[in-house]
Amino acid sequence: MAHTFDEKTTAQLNRAKEHFEQMFGKADRYLAVHAPGRSEIAGNHTDHEGGHVIAGALDVAIDAICAPNNLGVIRVASVGYDPFEVDYTNLEPTEAEYLSTKAIVRGMAANLVKLGFEPSGFDMAVVSNVPGGGGLSSSAAFEAAAGRAMEALWEGGSEISAVKLAQMSQNTENVYFGKPCGLMDQLAVCLGGLAFMNFEDPAEPQAEKLDLNFEDYGYALCLVDVGCDHVAFTDEYAAVPVEMQKVAAAFGKTRLSEVPVEDFQARVNELREDLGDRALLRAIHYWYENDLVDKRWADLQNSDIESFITLTNASGASSGMYLQNVSTSGSYQPAMLALGLAESILKGSGAVRIHGGGFGGSIQCFVPLALVETFIAQMNQWFGEGACRHYAISDQGACAQWL
């Protein structure tokens, strides 16, 4: 399928080509690769429980230029980072590579080889304006970009669907990158646009897209990097699905989507004694938030933005009170402080919520357009220049195109 890149993407691809030729020399032919960042619009920690999510690809992306090198290795040079090589004759995961881009390349190579692709050497020059560690899924974007590059450059395999690419990327994130995650991040990156996702069947997640930009309804989608990489709280993040799934296991199930809330309510006292209160609170959040996702999707379909805003605030409160992925132990509370300060500017208008995994990363704010300049300036004063940015939904998912 032919892809048309917008002016912003084309400019970033041109930078990637310059970097390619600086690092590797000129090539006979170039492959352009694009993978957007993403924003979780609704559904905080619902995906790993087989629940529902609304997510949107954003107008920030990882863009890369690739070409075969006939050297038997994959060479990657990202602007601002040290270059590295991956020997694709060794595709085993290793803890020494956890949380590294090298692990992502190795993991995606392993997944494509399993599909029947024949690996070969290539060079990849990367430019990104997706903030790393800020909750916009920079790792998922890199996974999807690497996967689309290998799909186009390697022989022997068949076309990879967006869902399959997302599942391969999730495997890479979990097994090679060493970070637990649901499927939402990767599927949003691979699909593009604004999409409702149903993860009840993990083998065949369902997705429905909607052509919508929040600016058309009077709101700016803003994300605030709170200045704390959520990688620092990987253990806290990992505890969320573990505790939710302990509740499910008490009913002989693997995920909360398989447990009727009425069955849970009938056994609260017993479950408190066996699992502790926090696991129950997180389960309560799942059912409440999943219902809010469905209601917010209906609101967006019906252009009822004010109801969407009201329910988004309810979602944010649930994350803080029940899911408990905003505050961390001790006096260092960057995400909660960001939410409180954002509320102090909005004064009851718009909506604020924790964004993505939580425990740092970023917060999400729907800001009335009349306030957006003031809001961004004030949040940047508190959290640093560039911490608060106004984003738009991008319809382009992860793709590759020969130039």
Q: What do the PLM-derived regions correspond to, one by one?
A:
Residues 1-31, 36-52, 88-92, 97-216, ...:
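Gly/Ser-rich oxyanion-binding loop with an adjacent helix/lid
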Residues 52-70, 191:
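Structural signature of FAD isoalloxazine-binding scaffolds in flavoprotein oxidoreductases
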Residues 140-141, 362-367:
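FabD-like malonyl-/acyl-CoA
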Residues 1-38, 63-98, 196-352, 365-403:
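C-terminal nucleotide
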Residues 359:
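Glycine-rich phosphate-binding loop
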